[in-house]
Structure formats: C-alpha cells, structure tokens
Amino acid sequence: KEGYPVDWGNCKYECMSDEYCKDLCADRKATSGYCYKLNWSCYCKGLPDDSPIKTPGKCRSGR
C-alpha cells in the first residue's frame, strides 16, 4: 500500500528532504519514499499492509 506514514497520534512526518523520507519509509519496510513538498510530508510506496498511514481525523500530537 502507499500513503503518508504516521506516528501513534495519526500525525504525518514533516520533511524538507527526500533523503529523510527515504530512510523513514525504509524503516517501515516500504519500497520507496519521498518528501511531498506541497504539504511538506513524507509519502511512502510499497508499505506492508499492517503499516499505519494517515486516516481521516485530527493529528493528536503530544510530542
């Protein structure tokens, strides 16, 4: 699957570089990833089915 990877609070990972997102996506066993610059968020392709991605609803930050 593909989508924006999220943390425990359904918050996307902000980015400024593709390199950061490639590493983040690789850590989640995705085949590729990049920084989607229109909203400055990491986007992964080829994620395992059990990997959490952004769902509708608010980000519950508490970082």
From Swiss-Prot:
Question: Which UniProt keywords are given for this protein, alphabetically ordered?
Answer: Disulfide bond, Ion channel impairing toxin, Neurotoxin, Secreted, Toxin, Voltage-gated sodium channel impairing toxin
| Location relative to the cell | Secreted
Which domain of life does this protein belong to? Eukaryota
Q: Which GO terms describe its cellular component?
A: extracellular region
Concerning SUPFAM superfamilies, the annotation shows: Scorpion toxin-like
- Which SMART domains does the UniProt record give? Knot1
Record-level Gene Ontology MF annotations: sodium channel inhibitor activity; toxin activity
Domain LCN-type CS-alpha/beta: start-end pairs: 1-60
Tissue pattern of expression reads: Expressed by the venom gland.
Gene Ontology terms: biological process: defense response
Q: Name one Pfam family in it.
A: Toxin_3
Disulphide connectivity of cysteines: 11-59, 15-35, 21-42, 25-44
Q: What is known of its domains?
A: Has the structural arrangement of an alpha-helix connected to antiparallel beta-sheets by disulfide bonds (CS-alpha/beta).
Family under the similarity heading: Belongs to the long (4 C-C) scorpion toxin superfamily. Sodium channel inhibitor family. Alpha subfamily.
Function description: Alpha toxins bind voltage-independently at site-3 of sodium channels (Nav) and inhibits the inactivation of the activated channels, thereby blocking neuronal transmission.
User: What is the protein name stated in its UniProt record?
Assistant: Putative alpha-neurotoxin RjAa9
Q: Native species of this protein?
A: Rhopalurus junceus
